[in-house]
Amino acid sequence: PTDDEWALTRRAALYKLERRTFIPLQEIIYQLLGAGTGPGRGQRQEEEERFERLRALVAAQPQSFLEIQPSHQSPSEWKSAIALFDSMDNYSLPSEKAAVLVEVARCIYETHGREHGADAVGGSGASPQKQPTPMAAADFLPIFIFVLARCHLRSVIVTRHLVSETMITALMIGETGYYATMLEAAIGYIAAFDGAAKAVGRSSGSGSTATSSF
């Protein structure tokens, strides 16, 4: 077998292991993460309700408030990516939710390329091709925050814990790990939102984002 075939086999085995370990413990895990009953449920519920209020405030802001550059703002307001985020509730395994997270990110890039590509004529006889304006990580995060704020996930906080804390470590590599970090950063921004300052990262020049206590 080639290296790619071994990698696919290993990943399939890890997914199977996750399914066998997570499903039997799913109810307990959700209770521990705040989706069930038990000690501390009231406090967790208050924290989540506070977060959802802040998320609604962020969702009410235009793209420009989050310092999404005009060259990156979406005329469709990233509806395709938001719809993908909404579908995350249809999955239970952490790896499945993480896979949706990666698809959301790819959809953002695809939407950007489709909506902001510039016609560029190639060599002799070449037909015009769409050349999207490059999007750096600093450009991506505000868009991701916008999408997260406007999606309809039942519990962003529980989703964050499932992806970041219960997923098999070996699966948290590459794109999955990167966008899980983006999710953490987006939640941190929303949790620290005060409705006044634009604090996605560029305003202070530090490039940092707020951290979340959730």
Where would I find each of the regions flagged by the language model?
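Extended serine/threonine-enriched, polar tracts that run as long, contiguous segments within proteins
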Residues: 88-156
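Eukaryote-specific, cytoplasm-facing alpha-helical/coiled-coil scaffolding segments in long proteins
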Residues: 44-62, 125-128, 139-147, 166-177, ...
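C-terminal regulatory/linker segments that are acidic, Ser/Thr- and Pro-rich
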Residues: 180-214
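Short, hydrophobic/amphipathic alpha-helical patches that form generic packing surfaces
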Residues: 20-27, 141-151, 158-165, 185
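Acidic, serine/threonine-rich, charge-biased low-complexity segments
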Residues: 1-10, 121-127, 206-214
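Catalytic and GAP-homology cores of small GTPase regulators
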Residues: 1-109, 115, 119, 178
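Short alpha-helical "patches" and their helix-cap loops
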Residues: 37-45, 156-169
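Intrinsically disordered, low-complexity regions enriched in proline, serine, glycine
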Residues: 33-34, 114-118, 156-158, 172-176, ...
